[in-house]
Structure formats: structure tokens, C-alpha cells
Amino acid sequence: MKKSSILWTALACLVMSPAAWPQSAETSRTADILRRARAYQFQFRAGQYDVAPQYVAMLEEAPKADPENADLSNALGVAYLAKSAGAMLTGGKPADAWTGVRKGMQAFEHALELNSDHAEALATHGGVQALMASFQQAPQQAAKGVAEMNRAVELAPNSVRVRLQRAFSSLSLADALRNNAAEAEDLDFLIKVAEGSRPGDYLHIMRGDLYFERGKLDLARNQYEVVGKSASPAAAEAKARLIALTQGGVAVTDIKKLRSAAGANCTMCHGR
């Protein structure tokens, strides 16, 4: 898979993770707008990419009535990223998509001007910055993005969205920028949340892959066996991993393929 495709699928997963607004005091009108934004987000992640224009338009208008609300700015940033990711996933123009990403980043930055401890804005801004900078081979900027995601987890350690963002962003970064300990912590948290579901099964495989990358083959096998014994759609992939362990190891291409599929389809994040 091309680096640009990996970048866009990773961004898509960030967008498709449902936000947990609000983090600010809301008027009834603002609360209603945020509920509608969340509904648009669920439609978008279900593949209804054509909702993006009205999703963005609603949130561009909303701050006029409540200009100091960080949640609205954060929601607008997510909407811009959704529009960009939707365009690229349906064959749109890269230049138009990048314009949306820039607008999204500006919206997150405005949210952080209003509330410097807004965990979701920090996580998403940091995740996008880390991915883009890694793609552009700018390690210092990527490291700043990683630091923002780490700060977001410190602020909201029990936020599924924040954990998802850091986990999936980190797994998509260049090896020199990855933090295996943080990835393990996030995956373990997410496995507990999703235990017994299809997302949980795929997360177990990803956790096994991380163990394999670190040379902990017995622990990797344990994770694969949990899924391989189940009736889950993920069982076939887990069994293939178990066979691979007896034949020299899991192929890097298979590990990356699953991570890319997670970004494109969000099966780990949302499937049941």
C-alpha cells in the first residue's frame, strides 16, 4: 500500500471514531447541534460520505451563536477531516482534501485556544500532525504530535476516542516514532472495552502482532489462540497467524494489512 493511502486510511479512522462531546458548558441549542454532529458522524462512518457537505455547513454556522465554545470548534475540525477523508476514499482530488485537512487543523487549534486541556482536540490535532509529519519526513513535528496525544491520554485516560486516536496513529507511524509501550497500553484498554465483540477479536490479533514485533512469541500465540478458538469472523486470520508462527513468523505485510484495514473500515473501532 502506498504511503499516501496509509495516511488517508489512518485519517479516516480518526474521523470515524465517535466523539464524546461535550467537554464545555453547553446551551440547549449548542447541545442539539453537537447531537446532530454526532449523528452525522455515525452516518459518515456507515459509508454515507455524501452527508459531509451539510455536516460541515452546520458546524461552520454554529459558532456564530456560541463563539467561545471549544466543543463546537473541535466538532468543526472533525467535520472538515470527514469531508477530506470522504473525498479521498471516493476518488476525489488530493488538493481539495488537503485544503479540508488544513481547515480542520485550524479548527482544532482554535478549540485549544479556547480550552488548552480539551483532550479530544489535542488527540485529533496531535494524531493528524504526527501522521502528516511522518509522511513528510519531518520527525520533530511528528514528535510534537505524539506529545499532544500523550497529553490527551493524561487528561482523559478513560476516553475511548482518545485511546483509539493514539493507538491507531502510533501504529501507522514510522518505527522510529512509535512507542510500543503506549501502543500496548492503549490496545489493552480497548480490548477490555470491546471484549467479546468482533472489534475485540481484531484488537486481540493486533495485540498479538505487537507482541510478535517485540519478540514475545508465546504472548503473541496466546492472543491469537483467544480468537482462533472463537466463532468470530476474525478466527480465520488468527489461525493463519498461529500457522505462521510455526513457519518462521508473521509476515510484516500481513501485520500492516490488518492495521490498514482497521483504518479503512474501522472494524476494530465500531464493528459488531
Per-range role (PLM):
Residues W8-S17:
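Bacterial N-terminal signal peptides
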Residues N69, H118, S159, S197-G200, ...:
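Residue-level recognition of tetratricopeptide repeat
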Residues R35-M58, A79-A111, D117, T124-L155, ...:
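Short coil/linker segments at helix-helix boundaries
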Residues A75, T124, Q165, M206, ...:
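Canonical tetratricopeptide repeat
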Residues A143-A147, V160, A181-I191, L217-A234, ...:
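TPR/TPR-like (Sel1-like) alpha-helical repeat modules
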Residues A20-S24:
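Boundary at the C-terminal end of the N-terminal hydrophobic targeting segment
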Residues A262-R272:
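The canonical Cys-X-X-Cys-His
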Residues L72, A121, V162, L203, ...:
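TPR alpha-solenoid repeat register
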